[in-house]
Amino acid sequence: MEVILLERIAKLGQMGETVKVRDGFARNYLLPLGKALRANAANKARFESERATLEARNLERKSEAQQVADKLDGKSFIIVRSAGETGQLYGSVAARDIVDVLAAEGFNINRNQVNLNQPIKAIGVHKVTLHLHAEVDVAVEVNVARSAEEAERQAKGESLTSAEAIYGVDEDALKPEDFFNPEAEFAGEEE
């Protein structure tokens, strides 16, 4: 099916382009969300008459998204979760958790704008990309920790999942002799 794009869509085209897409993609996504029109003579004429309005609206949305991106750029957000001593979370941090933290800070971001390929399942500082507009992306840091104190330590660059952090032992200084005695007699069954 051929459609006329009403806004820029990643990996598909710019506003005003006529592109050929699969019928299901057009019927289930592009047309219901108002991102495209069927490419027929009447809709082409309608698009050309409304083109200036659509471009102005798109420019306004882009400038609003850019203002939010400027406020978010370089910010770090702390999420406190319970985790095991190795740093594995009991559960995970998903896009909705990040949206909740951003909302608490006064940013109105939708869950589908958070670009998180898979949930965060370990403590640490993670980079998360927010897709605010078709042409505006911003990266923020999400600091997942067991407590606010640990979040501060992680922000300074300290690792909380190393053997030193967990057991108070420098893992580079460990030798095999620390764990077993090489001169010990074999206590198992002999052949």
Curated annotation (Swiss-Prot):
Please give the start and end residues of each transmembrane region.
none
UniProtKB keywords: Ribonucleoprotein, Ribosomal protein, RNA-binding, rRNA-binding
Superkingdom is: Bacteria
What GO cellular component is one of the record's annotations? Answer: ribosome
Return the InterPro entries for the record.
Answer: Ribosomal_bL9, Ribosomal_bL9/RNase_H1_N, Ribosomal_bL9_bac/chp, Ribosomal_bL9_C, Ribosomal_bL9_C_sf, Ribosomal_bL9_N, Ribosomal_bL9_N_sf
Keyword Ribosomal protein set for record: yes
Could you state one GO biological process linked to this protein? translation
Is Ribosomal protein tagged as a keyword? yes
Molecular function per GO:
rRNA binding; structural constituent of ribosome
The record's section on PROSITE patterns has: RIBOSOMAL_L9
Q: Which PANTHER family match?
A: 50S RIBOSOMAL PROTEIN L9
Q: What is the purpose of this protein?
A: Binds to the 23S rRNA.
> What family does the Swiss-Prot or TrEMBL record give for this protein?
Belongs to the bacterial ribosomal protein bL9 family.
HAMAP family, alphabetically? Ribosomal_bL9 (MF_00503)
What is the protein name stated in its UniProt record? Large ribosomal subunit protein bL9
What would be the name of the gene that encodes this protein? rplI
